[in-house]
Amino acid sequence: MHIKVVHKSVKIKFSKMHGLGNDFIIINAMMQKTFPVTSNIIQNLSNRYTGIGFDQLLLVENSKNVNIDFHYRIFNANGTEVSQCGNGARCFALFVLLKKLTKKRTLYVSTNTTTLILNVLNNGNVCVDMGVPCFKLKNIFGENIIENSLHSIKFVNKIINYDLVSIGNPHCIIYVNNLKKYPVKKIGFYLSTHKIFPEGINVNFVEVLSKNEIALRVYERGVGETLACGSGACASVALGIQQGLLFNEVQVNLLNGILKINWKGGSEKLYMTGPAVHVYDGYFYL
């Protein structure tokens, strides 16, 4: 019996990393310009049974701006490109240091919609300047959204009230009384894929524990529920501060750990601090 061995021509190196269980593969696209970014390839790689398995794929690219250190691209597990990922930003910062792409511990990184400032702290945590939260809904969702209205939607026999915020990507935020018993996956999927959000939306379920602490679960568009969502933590805290429910410094309890969010409100920038972990390096063939 003869077995035909198929040799695939493109070898791609990657690092597996995670921020509180929100996991990624990161690829240095500055050195590996042949990596083809297609939805089909990303979906195959993200499969946790037949591929590597991850929530998002992150690319490190050269910046076209001399004042920016790197360009940061983010692809969800379903292959769609998005503009923000807070946990990914922390892993991005650790990656470029570990791979000696820079010696800087303060990095200026562009995305498709904004510029992030990433600070790698001496204790190994990363503090991310996430910019200014946006509550101007027409800037986020277009002219069909009514500003300052009570947003609600019917799900089975109940009415769900929600708020909308952007922190570089869109978030729908729902306050709940008992996060452990709430049907996060069912309602998360329903809202995330609803026709009122043609590009999808991240759905955040928030239980306010005190003025300086919340519990949070997030159903991410194009991924599903994740163990943590950095931008979701930022958006949820920003809304709580704006509504007077929270103080300016808040601990966010996610399924797999804790993030610290600091925002003084108004036009001030919001800061997120948390860990980033390198798991292993590997390669795959295409």
UniProtKB/Swiss-Prot annotation:
| Reaction(s) the record says it catalyses | (2S,6S)-2,6-diaminopimelate = meso-2,6-diaminopimelate
What main location does UniProt list? cytoplasm
Q: Where does substrate bind?
A: N22, Q56, N76, G86, N87, N169, N202, E220, R221, G230, S231
Q: Which chain positions lie within coiled-coil regions?
A: none
Does this UniProt record's set of keywords contain Isomerase?
Answer: yes
Q: Where is this site: Could be important to modulate the pK values of the two catalytic cysteine residues?
A: H171, E220
Name recorded for this polypeptide: Diaminopimelate epimerase
Native organism: Buchnera aphidicola subsp. Baizongia pistaciae (strain Bp)
